[in-house]
């Protein structure tokens, strides 16, 4: 059964593993691909995203039974004054519907938390645009590099 799990510091090995995996991080190819996430960064990261999120950040692992299969998050972009979504499925688990289910759960939680709209910047060559459109997001803007998608949670 798919659920969202709040990771403890000792669970961040999975985030490190995903961020170090070339296939999982292929969506980030324009910015260098993989991102180091050594254990020395875990405490500060956990403090900012989990402990002291100030209502401006939300982060969970996607868990199917006892296996971590990805992550979902949203955060408030101060510069643009919008909430940005993050959905990453660990490469071995892609194509099994986890992204769609997790994005739907994330939207429900954001709505429960009083958020009216969610956005994401998706690279123009990233196939996840389809996922967002199927989950009710609409294209808000397009450039040569990325597509900004938006979903209204309150009508």
Identify what each model region corresponds to:
Residues 90, 119-130:
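Conserved beta-strand-loop-alpha-helix junction that forms the acyl-donor binding cleft
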Residues 119-123, 136-151:
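Conserved catalytic-core motifs of GNAT/GCN5-like acyltransferases
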């Amino acid at each position: 059964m798919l659920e969202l799990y709040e990771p403890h510091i000792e669970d961040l090995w999975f985030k490190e593993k995903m961020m170090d995996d070339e296939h999982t991080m292929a969506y980030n190819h324009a910015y260098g691909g993989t991102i180091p996430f050594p254990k020395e960064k875990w405490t500060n990261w956990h403090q900012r995203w989990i402990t002291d999120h100030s209502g401006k950040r939300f982060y969970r692992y996607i868990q199917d039974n006892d296996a971590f299969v990805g992550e979902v998050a949203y955060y408030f972009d101060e510069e643009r004054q919008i909430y940005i979504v993050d959905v990453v499925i660990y490469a071995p688990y892609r194509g099994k519907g986890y992204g769609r289910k997790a994005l739907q759960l994330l939207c429900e939680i954001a709505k429960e938390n009083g958020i009216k709209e969610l956005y994401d910047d998706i690279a123009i060559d990233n196939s996840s645009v389809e996922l967002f459109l199927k989950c009710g997001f609409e294209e808000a803007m397009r450039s040569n590099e990325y597509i900004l998608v938006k979903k209204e949670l309150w009508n």
